[in-house]
């Protein structure tokens, strides 16, 4: 049913290296937030097999004139479990690309990083560049169980 607030959405094209594809979807209140721009992160030649991300980030810049942070960027990622550490580390390159393109530092990296269990080991975390970047704040502690199942 229709609510009292207007909503809009922005959806990516189907993304993925194989016949299996996924899309990123942003749903937002159009009376509060507007889209200023979007792009797909260029992570290399997909058909050549030397791209970084299984599903490259669909980066969206928003305007929110009534909030303290009036412009911000959302960067979604659903990493491939078998390459989670490499894809999470490559978010550093996406982060710097957003800063270089739009000159903005209010960036939220979000999604299913597959960063728990055996996908990203404790020995891999120190080499993930965003973990040591002082400009980044990790909002979910490593100890949080973010799975929907009863076990990890």
Model-derived regions, located:
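Divalent cation-coordinating acidic motifs and surrounding scaffolds
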Residues: 1-152
């Amino acid at each position: 049913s229709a609510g009292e607030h207007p909503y809009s959405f922005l959806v990516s094209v189907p993304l993925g290296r194989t016949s299996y594809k996924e899309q990123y979807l942003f749903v937002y209140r159009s009376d509060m937030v507007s889209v200023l721009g979007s792009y797909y992160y260029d992570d290399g030649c997909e058909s050549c097999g030397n791209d970084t991300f299984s599903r490259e980030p669909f980066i969206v810049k928003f305007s929110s004139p009534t909030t303290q942070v009036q412009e911000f960027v959302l960067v979604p990622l659903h990493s491939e479990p078998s390459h989670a550490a490499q894809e999470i580390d490559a978010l550093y390159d996406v982060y710097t690309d957003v800063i270089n393109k739009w000159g903005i530092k209010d960036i939220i990296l979000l999604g299913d990083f597959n960063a728990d269990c055996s996908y990203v080991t404790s020995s891999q975390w120190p080499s993930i560049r965003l973990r040591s970047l002082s400009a980044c704040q990790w909002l979910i502690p490593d100890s949080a169980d973010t799975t929907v199942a009863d076990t990890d």
